[in-house]
Amino acid sequence: MLFPLTIDLPHGTAPDASHPLYDAAVTTRGLCPSCGREHTLPAGVARAECASLMRLLEQHGRIDMQAPDDAADPHFSLDYLHGVARGQMFGVLVVRTQDGSYGTLRAFSAQYNRVWHVAGWVPPLIDIAAFDAQVAKDDPVINALGRRIRELDATIAAERDAAEQTPQAISDTTAPVVTADTGPMSVDEAPAPTRIDLLMRERAALVDERKGLSQRSMRAIHELYRVHSFGNRTDRADRAASLFEIFPAGRGVPTGTGDCCAPKLLQYAILHNMTPLGLAEFYWGRESRSGARRHGEFYPSCQDKCYPILGYMLCGLEERAVTG
C-alpha cells in the first residue's frame, strides 16, 4: 500500500519546503467542528508524485498495476474512464512513517467500476460488508416502488389518451366515487376522470413512500462511515466520529460524502500512524458532464462534501508535525 517516493531525495534530506519540487499551494483544507479552526495541508511534493502516477497509468492502461500483465483484470482497464462512465479523481498523499522513512499512498474516488477495493489503493472509509447488507435490504423495495410508479405512468397516459378520444362520454359522466349503497369504487369501476384521479393519488403516495425509504436508507448508509482525526490519535482517544457529528446541525450530508480521495488517504495515514506532508488530486479520463473536470488537471479538495470532514481529520496534525 505504501510506495517509495519517485522524486530524487538525496540522503539525509526530506520532501519538505527545501526540496526544489515542493509546492506550497494549499490543496486540502477544512473547518473543524470541534475546535472551530480551519486546518490545511499543502501540495508539497505530491504533485510531482502524481505526475509519476499519471505516467504509470498511461504505461499500464489499468489501475491494477500490481498484477502481472497476464493476470490483469479487464474490469480495471482505464477504458472505463474514457467511456460512458467518464473520468474520476485520483490522489496521492506523501507521508512520513513512524521509522522516519518517506513514501506515498494512492487513492481513487468512490468506487472504480463498482469495485471498492483494488490492490495498491487505500480502502474506503465505509464498512463494505455493512454497506452491501444495507443496499441488499433496501434497494429491492425501492426498485419495486420505482417499477410500480412507471407502470402507473403508463396507465395514466393510456387513460388520458382514451379520455381525449371520448370527450362527450366523459362530460356526461356524473357518477360519484362513493355511494351509500355501494361504498368505494375500485379504479376499474370508476368513470374515466375518477380513474385518472385515483391513479394519480396512488402514484403520489408511492412517490412519497419511495422518497422516504430512500432518505432513510441513505441515512443508514451515512451512519456506517466512521471518520478518524489526527488529534484523536495524538490524544490516544482514537474515537471515530460519524458524518452526522461532523456536519453542521440542520445541514444534510451530501451524497458521496467520505468517498473522495483526500478523506480516504488521510484516514489510512491516521490509522497507520503516518504523518502527511503533502496531498494532491487530479482528474483522469473523459471530461465531466459539467465540463468542470478535465483530463490530467489538478483540483483542490471539494468544498461541499470534503470541507467539514477534512477539517475534523486534519485537526491535531500541526501538533504531530511539531513533535515529529
Residue ranges and their predicted role:
Residues M1-G324:
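Catalytic cores of nucleic-acid editing and processing enzymes
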